[in-house]
Regions:
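A short glycine-rich, Lys/Arg-flanked "PGG" loop and its adjoining helix->strand segment in the class I
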Residues: 118-133
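Short aromatic-enriched loop/helix-cap "lid" or pocket-rim segments at secondary-structure transitions
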Residues: 79-81, 145-150, 208-212
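Conserved class I S-adenosyl-L-methionine
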Residues: 134-160
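Acceptor-substrate binding/catalytic loop of class I
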Residues: 169-183
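Short N-terminal helix/helix-N-cap motif within the alpha/beta-hydrolase-1
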Residues: 51, 113-117, 146
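Conserved N-terminal segment of class I S-adenosyl-L-methionine
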Residues: 1-96, 102-106, 121, 229
Length: 239
């Protein structure tokens, strides 16, 4: 098989990617409804891209109003689903204190530069109401197939070697993540004042995995209970 063929096997089809997004949305929405206050009205997604997950939170959760911020946005826009999306970074949230009941922080922390991690969690804490919650997900950098590059053992390498190895990645984007674990995130959240309410291992079902390597996911099913693809978490700003 050619190198191009091998790379193609590591990428999800449109249907597999759509299934992945649906699974992620459903699991995060369940956490929002379980841990947010019964009268919660306002949510914000940190790192919303173009608002696909933001919109899903409005559809799937009891929280009716959602907004989002993303550094790639150049101006304020309204998504097709009616969510207002703003340019911005987690380290500088342009909202008043105690604005939101829920902050969604899914697959974002690993992209935050080290010198912005503490201030980012402090900013999220600031814009949450007392009793507000952070719901999110963090990919495991030590999972055998690293999620950003789709390459084996990328997260185990020193950063300099990661950039060299990235040239073999089948993806169209560049290297843009840091190796951080749930322990790093929990410590950062606790320094900001959050209580850790819940952490769980999370793995996507086989139908999300590219069909060409789905057999490997089935073989790894048992080890993945201990070495998960990612962690999902809930942090609470004390009331």
């Amino acid at each position: 098989m050619s190198t191009r063929g091998i790379r193609a096997q590591l990428l999800q089809t449109d249907d597999e990617w759509e299934t992945r997004n649906a699974v992620l949305s459903r699991h995060l929405a369940d956490l929002v409804d379980e841990y947010s206050a019964s009268g919660a009205t306002d949510g914000i997604e940190i790192g919303c891209q173009v608002g696909a997950l933001t919109e899903q939170m409005g559809r799937l959760t009891r929280v009716p109003t959602w907004t989002g911020i993303d550094p790639a946005l150049t101006e304020k826009i309204v998504s097709d689903g009616g969510c207002t999306l703003h340019p911005g970074r987690a380290s500088r949230l342009d909202f008043p204190d105690e604005t939101f009941d829920v902050a969604l922080f899914a697959n974002v922390f690993e992209h935050v530069p080290p010198d912005e991690r503490d201030v980012s969690l402090r900013e999220i804490y600031r814009v949450l109401k007392p009793g507000g919650v952070v719901i999110g997900q963090l990919p495991n950098p030590y999972f055998p197939i690293e999620s950003h590059s789709r390459l084996p053992f990328m997260g185990w390498l020193p950063t300099k070697w990661q950039h060299r190895y990235w040239k073999l990645a089948p993806v169209s984007w560049g290297h843009d993540f840091y190796v951080v674990t749930i322990k790093d995130l929990k410590r950062t959240a606790q320094r900001a004042g959050f209580d850790v309410a819940h952490v769980r291992n999370f793995n996507y079902p086989p139908e999300v995995i590219p069909n060409g390597v789905r057999w490997a996911a089935r073989l790894l099913e048992r080890p993945m209970r201990y070495m998960p693809w990612s962690w999902q978490f809930v942090f609470v700003r004390p009331a």
